[in-house]
Amino acid sequence: MHVPPTDPARSAPPASPHRRRRPKALGLTALAAAMLMAVPTTQAAFGSDVRPAAAQEVVGGGDLGPNVLVFDPSTPDIQGKVDEVFRKQESNQFGTDRYALMFKPGTYNDINAQIGFYTSIAGLGLNPDDTTFNGDVTVDAGWFDGNATQNFWRSAENLALNPVNGTNRWAVSQAAPFRRMHVKGGLNLAPDGYGWASGGYIADSKIDGEVGPYSQQQWYTRDSSVGGWGNGVWNMTFSGVEGAPAQSFPEPPYTTLETTPVSREKPFLYLDGDDYKVFVPAKRTNARGTSWGNGTPEGESLPLDQFYVVKPGATAETINAAVDQGLHLLFTPGVYHVDQPIEIDRANTVALGLGLATIIPDNGVTALKVGDVDGVKVAGLLVDAGPVNSETLVEVGSDGASGDHAANPTSLQDVFVRIGGAGPGKATTSIVVNSNDTIIDHTWVWRADHGEGVGWETNRADYGVHVKGDNVLATGLFVEHFNKYDVQWSGENGKTIFYQNEKAYDAPDQAAIQNGDIKGYAAYKVDDSVTTHEGWGMGSYCYFNVNPDIRQQHGFQAPVKPGVKFHDLLVVSLGGKGQYEHVINDIGDPTSGDTTIPSQVVSFP
């Protein structure tokens, strides 16, 4: 899934598909005892490992557990502690360790925080400029020989950076959001050596200098400000970005919307004096630029004692009891097995994960169910399918939901789904959205193509995302490798701004993917009954490495109606491993050969 950037003078990685090599296994080291000096926060007494029975009152507030490391400028040996986490997590792609590195407001000098798997770094101010690094927050790809295409599951948030050499490096692929950041310099999105990279997502951020994507295949930037944008490979999409390049797809491949129709930034933890709170930003319509650039952002602050602070070992029964009592949910870093769905049926509930908190459904249950109510905010969670097939992993609203939530929509933000990779996993449909007006803001829904428990039937997952509600908006939709439809859209007036897809690598033959008389299931299917739908900046790639003779009829399928519109579509055959015959329906040139050159459609119909 990789080609050189458009300017070979700046970098020249070879053209070749991605994620074909397994990473080298590196031994895990124990965290140094000195790291424990970064003491987890304490507030009201919570802290017992013994969880209350569901019939008992669930207590809100408390400490944030051992995997949230909180620093202030006087903490000794900050660099050493951060480095120790990185050594543990640099190549720990399918491990169970989770960390959140939290920095109290202040100035930190000579810091280079390298961020590995399942690690989140964040400032604890209300605004990014409250917490300043004279230094860098870095993601590179030394662990994988300069290939950044497996730099998944990590995040940076709510910090200001003065990069040491003037440019910060954030060389990531999917599920690695860069939110609410102020880079007082440039931002390099490619690894050292300009190897392959497959990102990515920026939101609510200000980059004073130029952003250099270099070898990045695609990228989505929302409601931000940039000092310039260097290049594009296949698909660079912007909505509500000050300083974004002008609309010019296909050459250069820039898709630019002046504003984002509806957005609401992700909730985040911060310090108000000595008290921990969660800030819940307000919804914005037709947003452009950051939410914080003009001072205090609009939104609501919730004290920590209104949250059940969920720690590893907590049961779904207790989590649900907390919601029933009126508490919000703050998942501390860890892995949580649930034997029944986590159910959020109360309007305006916040469920926020720290450090890529991970939920695994046992015995085929659904991991998370959100009711058809107003304003639920779910953010910062990884749902990892279990070995017994789940019909669904995440549901928003029940089937047939009909409520009007336009004034106060439910949102899924940085909610990631994985089927296989860490071990056997199966799910029929990963995410089902029944509620009207839902916002899906940055998700990576991934049927694993490498790791443990991977095979056409071993990690069977027919459908990625199925949208049934009306007026649903997806901003930054990454869905890959499903056995049938990656995205199916049945609701009216849906919108998608940026879509990245790969079809499943491991189809054994043409018959395995045949969809009636259609060769292969579309990567993005709009049902024939739909009359209004619109999408911008959308790409699908194929790499049928098991059987390169497979033909995919099209990447996109939609009814030909005046209200169904697409802008800036592309399909790519990665190294000639399989081919597309068209881009959308029977429109668009076929891909051919092994040159990894996209076939594009600028507008549909």
Swiss-Prot record:
Report which reactions are catalysed by this protein.
Successive hydrolysis of beta-D-glucose units from the non-reducing ends of (1->3)-beta-D-glucans, releasing alpha-glucose
What transmembrane ranges does the database entry give?
none
Which parts of the sequence are annotated with region: Disordered? Answer: 1-23
Catalytic positions are 502 (proton donor)
Q: Which GO terms describe its molecular function?
A: glucan exo-1,3-beta-glucosidase activity
What would changing residue 449 to A do, according to UniProt? 1200-fold decrease in catalytic efficiency
Entry's Gene Ontology BP terms: glucan catabolic process
What is this protein's name?
A: Exo-beta-1,3-glucanase
